[in-house]
Amino acid sequence: MRQFTHGTLLAILALANTISAIPSFSANNYPAHPAEPLALFAQSQPQAPLGLWTRLRNSVIERLWGVPPQQRNHRGGNKQYPFYSAPASLQARYSDDVVLRFRLQTADEVKALVEASNILFLDVWASTDEWVDIRLAKDVVPSLLGLLPKSLQTAHVPLIHDLPQTVYESYPSSSQRPTDNGRGFLPSRESSSDVTNIFFEDYQPLSVIGPWMRLLASMFPSHVQLISIGSSFEGRDIPALRVGVRPANDPKPRKTVIIGGGSHAREWIGVSTVNYVAYSLITTYGKSTPISTLLEQFDFIFIPTINPDGYVHTWETDRLWRKNRQETSLPFCPGVDLDRTWGFEWNGNATGDNPCSESYGGDEPFAGTEARQLAGWVKEQTEQHNVKFVAYLDLHSYSQQVLYPYSYSCLPRPPNLENLEELAMGIAKAIRLTNRQSYTVSSACQGFTASQKKVKLDTFPRMESTGGSALDWFYNDVGVKYSYQLKLRDKGSYGFLLPRENIVPTGKEVFNAVMVLAKFLLGSDGFEGLNWEAEFQRLNEADKPILDDGDDDEEEDGQDKKDDSWIPDEYKNDNDHDDDDDGWGLRRRRKR
């Protein structure tokens, strides 16, 4: 980046100042931070921190001119921060809720839990071959347990002991952001930190993500273009970044990879990870031979917020909102699940009469506005712009899984199953080698299987309908050979409320996974003598894992002391299900 002229540098800095003063998108499309809970953090601040765009501008100076940054007290380590209690609004919304993890061992148990969840309209957070996490009101717990077999009535533990506080802590905190003490750009002996620490030190609202994407397109016009996929139900733009260097007058179809996140609004780590991978590819172009060659042969489309309306809603009203925000036949139950509304094997009959279901796929295929917009854009690119989509990564959370087609059923065998499995295993390996985080690999259809301790593995029923998924539509209807859904961190300690300290480590894991995908797509074309593994090691510095996968977690500060006063005595845990049994692997939530 040092080849920029002095005039170019001044232009970039002027652009950063301009963007900080004039929003790139209308206020209607990108509303500001919610007044609560963020404003509460600032009440006791003696000195306001610099604005985000000011810090971004400063980071450009550091990066381009090599000026060491001022000292910053980044979150983490031994630094102690003031404790703030969740405001009354969050207490009112979430204090009566609990997240329970059920351990499942038989098909009958799964079937009973599925039926009970449907009857009570419960919010299933995540499920694997061993457990299911469900959020419900505490006063509904007796009704749920009463519908379950005796073996399940005590086979559960609470995951998050203080849901309002955990929700509150997931929002950015101005009091926890490093302050500059008015020192500006004084030299420091501290080694230069990565510019990513500024944008990726916290989750960002849509009002920041949009201008940030525009800034990247303005700074790197040679290989970055800001595009629009379409409009949401509420009229917001669905922005995307096209990253690549397309040769002029090339008659061959342009091979293109789509990486998207935010289909489910509450899954903030997916949004941040899409942005992180985009930033990493953009800023590494010209510095790494593999990445430069990759972007000359492939375009990457990064869509961080496929569901902008729902994402804004999680910032302004309900942090745990999942669907989009369009109207349904029931005015008090808005929203369509954007991963259950796609046209291939749409299974709306499963939830068609229940718009209140969290997995409601609409009353017809492509009922979800944003999914319909993305499908139309993909069709237009294929038919009118000579684009060939070759890979699709759909980032979700949580449970740490790499899933491949098909989702709707296990009966059909994907024609390239062997290649799908091989690449999926490579993706999981890359993630494990980055930060020692383990991801399981399976077909998205598999649902639940019996414990591996048993000789025979039986396929269990699934907790929710899996027809109409984006994963299957891209694979079958578009012909994308490598279509995957990645369910990111964690495995339940925080669920959708993953602490901000996980943003960069998760981003690095998925960036390395994308590099494995790139190597798979490129093959040996022009890289016979290149050591990819050495190149990855050069580009990445592995972080220590924030959340360890081990089963040896120690109890800390009473975090394992659960309040079970709301559970009827007859349903309280007994010795039939040992929490420390092999395979249970419940990791306790830790204080930060």
From Swiss-Prot:
| UniProt-annotated location(s) | Vacuole; Secreted
Q: Where is the signal peptide?
A: 1-21
Task: Tell me if Metal-binding is a UniProt keyword of this record.
Answer: yes
- Residue ranges for the region (Disordered) are 170-191, 542-592
Q: Which domain of life is it from?
A: Eukaryota
Give the Gene Ontology MF terms in alphabetical order. zinc ion binding
- Bias-annotated ranges (Polar residues): 170-179
The alphabetical list of record keywords is: Cell wall biogenesis/degradation, Disulfide bond, Glycoprotein, Metal-binding, Secreted, Signal, Vacuole, Zinc
What cystine linkages occur within this chain? C333-C356
> Which segments constitute the Peptidase M14 domain?
202-521
Which residues form the pro-region?
Answer: 22-174
Q: Which GO terms describe its cellular component?
A: extracellular region; vacuole
Ranges of biased composition (kind: Acidic residues): 548-558
Swiss-Prot/TrEMBL GO biological process terms = cell wall organization; proteolysis
Q: What this chain does, per the record?
A: Inactive carboxypeptidase that may play a role in cell wall organization and biogenesis.
Name this polypeptide is given: Inactive metallocarboxypeptidase ECM14
Organism in which the protein naturally occurs: Ajellomyces dermatitidis (strain ER-3 / ATCC MYA-2586) (Blastomyces dermatitidis)
